[in-house]
């Protein structure tokens, strides 16, 4: 049985469609209304708030955290200010896209990365030889996305 997200108590009464799915072990709304049209136009013309708690979240910290981030994303992490967030693809050494998501700079040597798929092992492989810790904090960090 999927786990309710930390926002489930607020989102469940709004789900008129009763359409739920298992997203990475969490109970997630497929659509709130019986027709997707209202939601579609709300996002296109104004804004929408999504519960994205099921996204996988990783905390990278240590002297080489920025070096690890630069190894796996296509943007330059050295240009990120503390508090800044990038949306970026994650790529392997050949440029093949592994995933995409956000990277937030939390401090000089601290980052949080989010992804749709579980990539802890892949991040740990790329961290080999670096002085950086990589932790899966998915269950400790809830998330909302304003789009």
Task: Identify the function of each model-found stretch.
Residues 37-42, 95-97, 124-128:
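Short hydrophobic/aromatic-rich motifs at helix boundaries and adjacent loops
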Residues 1-91:
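Acidic, proline/glycine-enriched N-terminal capping motif
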Residues 99-147:
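Acidic, low-complexity central loop/insert segments
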Residues 85-104:
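Aromatic/His-enriched, Gly/Pro-containing loop or helix-boundary segments
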């Amino acid at each position: 049985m999927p786990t309710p997200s930390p926002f489930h108590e607020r989102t469940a009464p709004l789900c008129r469609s009763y359409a739920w799915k298992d997203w990475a072990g969490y109970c997630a709304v497929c659509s709130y209304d019986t027709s997707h049209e209202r939601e579609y136009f709300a996002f296109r013309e104004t804004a929408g708030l999504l519960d994205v708690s099921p996204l996988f979240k990783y905390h990278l910290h240590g002297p080489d955290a920025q070096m690890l981030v630069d190894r796996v994303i296509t943007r330059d992490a050295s240009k990120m200010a503390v508090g800044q967030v990038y949306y970026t693809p994650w790529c392997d050494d050949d440029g093949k896209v592994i995933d995409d998501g956000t990277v937030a700079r939390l401090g000089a040597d601290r980052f949080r990365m989010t992804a749709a798929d579980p990539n802890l092992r892949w991040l740990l492989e790329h961290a080999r030889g670096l002085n950086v810790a990589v932790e899966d904090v998915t269950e400790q960090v809830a998330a909302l996305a304003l789009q």
